[in-house]
Structure formats: C-alpha cells, structure tokens
C-alpha cells in the first residue's frame, strides 16, 4: 500500500485504516506525495478523530507543508471548527503565517473559529 491509500483513509476519516497504517510502521511525520503530511490532509478534510490519533502517535502539530501551511491554518482555511479547537487545545501555534502572510485569525471568515482564536 502506498501514499494514495493512506491519504484516502485520512481524508475519508477511516480511523481503523489509518491506525492500521500507523501501527504497521507508517511515519506520522513523513511528507507524503503532494508535499503534505498526514496532519494536513486530516485538517483539510475536517477529520478531528484522525487528527487526535495522529497527535497521539507523535505527529508534529506545527509541521509546515510544501507551501508553509500548518495543520491549524489548513483547518481555518476550510472552516473546520472542531479541528481548530482540537489543534489549539493541543498547543498549535496560532501566530504562524501562511504563504499569504496571514495568521490563523486573519485567514478565516468563520466567526466561531475567530472566537476560538481570540
């Protein structure tokens, strides 16, 4: 099984499959095809349970992808409040700026997310 299957499981929230990959030796901090890490795909797709599992296995909460985007920024861009809340509770750095020069608070129009970031 390659990156395609691992990324599919992450994006679709198939926690059992993600666990199988990770417990089978997949590195939760490895840069996957596409220049992103598992945390980015989970944050992009609103998969908070997958995020929590990856963090429990040592995933870097502030890892930047090939564009300089962190998982928190990914979750903010996509409007995934539960993911933002989880990442903040686990210590995500909300001051990091993305390639557009905006931090997490500045990068979202979602008021519920803005409230979490204040």
From Swiss-Prot:
Location relative to the cell: Cytoplasm; Nucleus; Cytoplasm, Perinuclear region
Keywords: ANK repeat, Cytoplasm, Nucleus, Repeat
Annotated PROSITE patterns: ANK_REP_REGION, ANK_REPEAT
KW Repeat (keyword) present: yes
Organism whose genome encodes this protein: Xenopus tropicalis (Western clawed frog)
Gene field: mtpn
Cellular compartments per GO CC: nucleus; perinuclear region of cytoplasm
Pfam families: Ank_2 (PF12796)
Claim: Repeat is one of the keywords in the record: yes
Function: Regulates NF-kappa-B transcription factor activity. Promotes growth of cardiomyocytes, but not cardiomyocyte proliferation. Promotes cardiac muscle hypertrophy. Plays a role in the regulation of the growth of actin filaments. Inhibits the activity of the F-actin-capping protein complex.
Family: Belongs to the myotrophin family.
Intervals holding ANK repeats: 1-30, 34-65, 67-98
Domain of life: Eukaryota
Protein name, UniProt field: Myotrophin
């Amino acid at each position: 099984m390659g990156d395609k299957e691992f990324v599919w499981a992450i994006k679709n929230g198939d926690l059992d499959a993600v666990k199988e990959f990770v417990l089978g030796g997949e590195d939760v901090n490895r840069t996957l095809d596409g220049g992103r890490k598992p945390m980015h795909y989970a944050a992009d797709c609103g998969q908070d349970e997958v995020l929590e599992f990856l963090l429990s296995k040592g995933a870097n909460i502030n890892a930047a992808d090939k564009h300089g985007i962190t998982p928190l920024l990914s979750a903010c861009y996509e409007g995934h409040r539960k993911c933002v809340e989880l990442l903040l509770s686990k210590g995500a750095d909300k001051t990091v700026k993305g390639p557009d020069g905006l931090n997490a608070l500045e990068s979202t129009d979602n008021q519920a997310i803005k409230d979490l970031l204040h």
